[in-house]
Swiss-Prot record:
Residues binding substrate, per UniProt: D153, T190, E191, Y192, E193
Pathway note: tRNA modification; N(7)-methylguanine-tRNA biosynthesis
Main function: Catalyzes the formation of N(7)-methylguanine at position 46 (m7G46) in tRNA.
Binding-site residues, S-adenosyl-L-methionine: E43, D68, N95, N117
Keywords for this protein: Methyltransferase, S-adenosyl-L-methionine, Transferase, tRNA processing
Protein name as annotated: tRNA (guanine-N(7)-)-methyltransferase
Record family assignment: Belongs to the class I-like SAM-binding methyltransferase superfamily. TrmB family.
Protein EC: 2.1.1.33
Pfam (any one): Methyltransf_4
NCBIfam families, per database record: PRK00121.2-2 (NF001080), tRNA (guanosine(46)-N7)-methyltransferase TrmB (TIGR00091)
Length: 213
């Protein structure tokens, strides 16, 4: 579903220094964007920002970068950041396919992929954020033994993604087909997750470790 463009969204984003429109300037030194050398965690497709805001609030010693393509949802994420006066989050409006242009190798310590588009049609599988063509890029940009945390409500996407991660040499550290009934205690819910779980949908979740061998 495409979001309706809001004319006010872009000016609001452009007026806030936490929104980075030229992220390539920090490719060699993301510490400059935050003013410290704390670890970098990345959320791909941050949506309205509930997840990354709670992460940042709980972990002030970690620098978070939220990426999404749509101004309309990024504005809502940014407002949450400002309401909580968080200083350890930056927002990037961009296509996730361009990640390699803004990060150098071995720079990211964790990636979160929450409820990405499942692209059910086989001819669109290459667009999935867990497809091997994306995973191979993430692996280069991430530090060895760092982790990708992946959540979805889609059974087929989760099943295929388990295979994708294995094909790309990731180590599966954790897997559950019903996150909210599992023993996992570190979960932070997204807006979509609350909606799906209230409808009785089981949330699938996995943790996959980068293994550069």
């Amino acid at each position: 579903m495409r979001l309706r463009r809001k004319a006010w969204a872009r000016p609001e984003l452009e007026s806030d220094p936490k929104v980075i429109y030229n992220p390539m300037q920090y490719k060699e030194n993301w510490q400059e964007a935050f003013g410290n050398n704390h670890p970098i965690h990345l959320e791909l497709g941050c949506g309205r920002g509930q997840f990354i805001n709670q992460c940042a609030e709980l972990n002030p010693h970690i620098n978070y970068i939220a990426i999404d393509l749509y101004d309309e949802v990024l504005v809502k994420a940014l407002r949450k950041i400002n309401e909580k006066a968080l200083h350890n989050v930056r927002v990037i409006p961009m296509n996730i396919a361009k990640l390699e242009s803004i990060f150098k190798h071995d720079q990211i310590e964790k990636i979160y992929i929450n409820f990405c588009n499942p692209w059910p049609s086989r001819r669109h599988h290459h667009k999935r954020l867990t497809h091997p063509q994306f995973l191979s890029v993430y692996k280069k940009l991430m530090k060895d033994h760092s982790e990708i945390w992946f959540k979805t409500d889609d059974d087929e996407l989760f099943k295929d993604s388990l295979r994708y991660f294995a094909e790309e040499g990731f180590i599966e550290k954790y897997r559950t087909f019903d996150l909210h009934q599992s023993e996992f205690t570190e979960n932070i819910k997204t807006e979509y997750e609350e909606k799906f779980s209230n409808q009785g949908v089981k949330i699938k979740f996995g943790i996959f470790e980068v293994n550069k061998g």
